[in-house]
């Protein structure tokens, strides 16, 4: 029985300048690895057996009502502008209206070459597909806006990277796939009518109360400020914050070489291609602001009097650091038991982070221990911790039920790098048990009792670098 879904493909109704229509490249022998039943139910996707799901979510068969296309965009990559990028290995099947009334994109990643593939094969291998599946679902469970994983399928075909690897396809669900780079390409080309139509579309879809291009900018800046504060509160490092990986929806998108830090250090970098540390953990707020400045530059091109609008756009972007700081303070305050932190609490939070850096304490486990037991064992210099702890307990004396506040803000488990690599290595050999175990724990991160997955890596297990690896 053919899979059905409530498709309503608004992007496909825009002019062809925004995309190229094409179908996924069929694969030889698809098989289903995982399917996200609760998400599928929200999307209104009909029931089907594993074989039918494998066929549809590998791109071998189109669901009824799909309008497949590859989207066009540009982007700054590590600060350098690339005037044309686009979906080089992804195809948007279409949009569905979920049972919650929201509009969602359904996209296949690894679905074959497109006109934007730039000599690539358009495919993905199993490792990055499973990484994004687990990490994006973990982020959702952690309360951070994110694209989500609907399905993972094997293609039955190999892909050639440094070696021969099993091919796979990820079905990704997003509020949309509009990026900063989507606006940049039409501003760069001076296609002002297209830029205006794209802006109107984005406002209608993501910021219906926004007043024109600058209203959209204000809404996106606010969403991105909340997003990056969420990352910082979890020790998450995106790794490739290019403008083509910056979503207008304010969702985390394109996980690539992402990672969660183990030992806390503000300068942590994992991405093998980030040689200068541009996207280091501590730089993420600054880069988010920089990306929004690029969005402002693109949006201004359509204004009747762009010079007059520059001042307002500048004020909007310059307000972002304060927005990020406020969102960060709120999240970090809760992690130490303060339900409504004020700027006066910043030294207390920063004092703990400084101590964690000096003592090489584990980021996730330190906050978990504060919430549920005694964090003293996380530190080598316990006298220094005791000094901080005295100030902390004095502050908590005014709080109601701080343990509950902390436990709701501090996960017990994250998808640690060494566990992700372990999961991928096993899956390549046909063993999906580690994937299923990690996924189960990370989708209930505040309640898991899997102490083994909570454990930081040993010296031999540390993963020093991550790779896009697509």
UniProtKB/Swiss-Prot annotation:
Keywords: ATP-binding, Magnesium, Manganese, Metal-binding, Nucleotide-binding, Nucleotidyltransferase, Transferase. Its EC number is 2.7.7.-, 2.7.7.108. Mg(2+) binds at residues 245, 254. The active site is at residue 244. Its cofactor is Mg(2+); Mn(2+). ATP binds at residues 86, 88-89, 109, 121-122, 172, 179, 254. Signal peptide: none annotated. Transmembrane segments: none annotated. One of its GO terms (molecular function) is ATP binding. The keyword Manganese applies. The keyword Transferase applies. It catalyses: L-seryl-[protein] + ATP = 3-O-(5'-adenylyl)-L-seryl-[protein] + diphosphate; L-threonyl-[protein] + ATP = 3-O-(5'-adenylyl)-L-threonyl-[protein] + diphosphate; L-tyrosyl-[protein] + ATP = O-(5'-adenylyl)-L-tyrosyl-[protein] + diphosphate; L-histidyl-[protein] + UTP = N(tele)-(5'-uridylyl)-L-histidyl-[protein] + diphosphate. Belongs to the SELO family. Nucleotidyltransferase involved in the post-translational modification of proteins. It can catalyze the addition of adenosine monophosphate (AMP) or uridine monophosphate (UMP) to a protein, resulting in modifications known as AMPylation and UMPylation. NCBIfam families: PRK00029.1 (NF000658). This is Protein nucleotidyltransferase YdiU. It comes from Roseobacter denitrificans (strain ATCC 33942 / OCh 114) (Erythrobacter sp. (strain OCh 114)). The gene is ydiU.
